[in-house]
Amino acid sequence: VNLGLARIQRLMFLLGDPQKKYKTIHVTGTNGKGSVTAMLASCLQAAGIRTGMYISPHLSSYTERMVIDGQPVSKQQFAETLSVVRDICEFMQGEGDEHPTQFEVLTAAAFLLFQKAGVEYAVIEVGLGGLLDSTNVIVPEVSVITNVTFEHADKCGGTLEGIATHK
């Protein structure tokens, strides 16, 4: 798999760039990303703002990764949205593009689900790294960095500064 944003950027473009239809908060760091993401989403929701939340990994079901106003998306919503994304992925392959990764497909599905649900804000947790992570197709209103340690040093640079740059 080639690291980079080209596949997810193309996929999002073909889906109509749903991630540009609402405001986003991007959360990265080594530890605490999921907790910070959940707290921010909860605060927005408590303020009466329709809110999406995207986290990874899940514990028991893929639908846990995509939350709207505190509730995981339904299996039906998830399946219908994945079907749309799958069709675009097949079109991309037919055009000679590399098939998006599983995480790219899930990220695209989350962003499309949030648009369809009419969220005002989506709080997005980075998957791996940051710089080349597929969630980086968003242009966030706010970026949050929790603590940074030597996690993923092989992929994000061998120094703390290199890792911080990636995150």
Regions found by a protein language model. Give the residues of each.
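ATP-dependent carboxylate-amine ligase catalytic core
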Residues: 5, 9-20, 46-138, 150-164
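A conserved segment at the C-terminal end of the G1
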Residues: 23, 27, 35-52
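Conserved beta-strand/loop subsegment of P-loop NTPase cores
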Residues: 142-149
